[in-house]
Amino acid sequence: MPLVIVAIGVILLLLLMIRFKMNGFIALVLVALAVGLMQGMPLDKVIGSIKAGVGGTLGSLALIMGFGAMLGKMLADCGGAQRIATTLIAKFGKKHIQWAVVLTGFTVGFALFYEVGFVLMLPLVFTIAASANIPLLYVGVPMAAALSVTHGFLPPHPGPTAIATIFNADMGKTLLYGTILAIPTVILAGPVYARVLKGIDKPIPEGLYSAKTFSEEEMPSFGVSVWTSLVPVVLMAMRAIAEMILPKGHAFLPVAEFLGDPVMATLIAVLIAMFTFGLNRGRSMDQINDTLVSSIKIIAMMLLIIGGGGAFKQVLVDSGVDKYIASMMHETNISPLLMAWSIAAVLRIALGSATVAAITAGGIAAPLIATTGVSPELMVIAVGSGSVIFSHVNDPGFWLFKEYFNLTIGETIKSWSMLETIISVCGLVGCLLLNMVI
């Protein structure tokens, strides 16, 4: 019966979001309320569970996402992202242009949300395709693959970070494992798959992009741009490595754990960026503060939706669904990684939103960790992989890709939807293989 109620809740969520076009946050809270009542929870307990779910999920997550958005916005506004892109492409040359685009997308993707990175790199992709006389998708697909993998696999992006919070996974290890799996995944979904699509040769659409192009003097140096944007990654990776190789009681371990905490790592990066991307570029504190304020507007609704997913998750836990799923897992031989991936994949195809699919699947799959002893970090990547599968017409990202690359719906499915599916399947296979050795 508990699983039937969960299924009803998921169907209700789909109806509210797809049929009635309801805001994701409101829909998630209403579904959490409905599932709690159907499970027989008292009214006051349901409300308390929803509050606890929102608060527990957004506790440190709001700080991480807030600081991450600030870092990304400063990187974009000062021309740092453009500097990274143009320098890498100049170094690689036309023959290896796909790899330059992949590396650029991967580097930029660490600091920027997918949509921001996508729009930011488009002029560069258009310029490369025109100057090298190559099909647009030949460089567009590697760019999209790199951005999508960082968005689905790696903290501090919203989906992986929120799932890591739900699963109580170590952010540093999640980042480390995610990076290991991301590299072959990007290669297959990007440069390799792009060669299959060389027959789709569409002209660059006119009038779709009018963002600022920075002059040489306006942009910070390549080294400053790269190292400032990668500060959180370096600090979190340092913590993960220190915890693996240093004995307990080592003097450096507390320092590494403090500096590598995701909140501290992103805060330190923002403080450095305020100087390297702001004061050092001649910007006033008022201008820097305007950038910081505008960055939060970008993620405000995203934070609420994630909080709503946390509320749904908490109701499932407090109503006993987690224990029911845990008991079921004792009677099945299905890999918890495969099950978590499948839940996220079904929700992704039905809902369209990778973030909502990831958060909802995280709440449903959370009991599997305690029951099976599977690595919570690999579970984060499994859910993240499932949440990006087969983007189609109910996903805004589908239409973003279609319009900017001047494609038909069929061509978008062949390129974008299949690209996302390759990423999803590679992520699952990678998790299953990595699970054998850790």
From Swiss-Prot:
Cellular component terms (Gene Ontology): membrane; plasma membrane
Organism: Escherichia coli (strain K12)
InterPro entries in alphabetical order: Glcn_transporter
Keywords noted in UniProt: Cell inner membrane, Cell membrane, Gluconate utilization, Membrane, Sugar transport, Transmembrane, Transmembrane helix, Transport
Keyword Cell membrane: yes
Similarity-based family: Belongs to the GntP permease family.
Annotated Pfam families: GntP_permease
Its job: Part of the gluconate utilization system Gnt-I; high-affinity intake of gluconate.
Transmembrane segments: 2-22, 23-43, 52-72, 108-128, 134-154, 174-194, 222-242, 258-278, 292-312, 327-347, 349-369, 370-390, 418-438
Main location: membrane
Protein name according to UniProt: High-affinity gluconate transporter
Biological process annotations from GO: D-gluconate metabolic process; gluconate transmembrane transport
Bilayer topology: Multi-pass membrane protein
Superkingdom of source: Bacteria
